[in-house]
């Protein structure tokens, strides 16, 4: 009884934290991809910014967050190449976001190729330079202010 109650307490307590990493190969589409590197720099895990993530949804639509604003747009996949277009974002002022939002948008703008290896999604530009790395996560942050 006590161990069962403890298990539920830990489960409920852990649901309030940011995305948890999932193991095993993940599909490119429909997976919550949490940004861990943008333009060669690690994405900091700070409480003051929203989680930076990307979801490639059905019918070529995408949504996510650049660390400050919600983003949405379109994507096209063809033989390992990727093209992001019709990008739109909210226009909130985020003092603590630094340049993460700019790095996220630039990574999507310059991406030409995509690979998925296990739990990682990587975007590469036309010079085959890696511009972003994302990690598959089971869900987004339970805190709406962080989404």
Q: Whereabouts are the PLM-identified features?
A:
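Lipid interaction determinants
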Residues: 2-8, 12-147
């Amino acid at each position: 009884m006590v161990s069962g109650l403890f298990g539920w307490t830990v489960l409920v307590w852990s649901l309030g934290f940011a995305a948890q990493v999932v193991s095993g190969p993940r599909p490119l589409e429909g997976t919550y991809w949490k940004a861990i590197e943008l333009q060669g720099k690690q994405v900091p895990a700070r409480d003051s910014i929203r989680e930076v993530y990307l979801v490639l949804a059905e019918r070529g639509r995408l949504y996510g967050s650049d660390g400050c604003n919600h983003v949405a747009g379109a994507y096209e996949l063809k033989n390992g190449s990727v093209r992001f277009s019709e990008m739109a974002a909210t226009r909130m002022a985020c003092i603590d976001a630094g340049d993460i939002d700019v790095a996220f948008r630039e990574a999507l703008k310059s991406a030409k190729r995509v690979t998925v290896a296990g739990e990682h999604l990587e975007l590469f530009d036309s010079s085959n330079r890696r511009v972003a790395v994302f990690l598959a996560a089971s869900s987004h942050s339970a805190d709406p202010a962080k989404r």
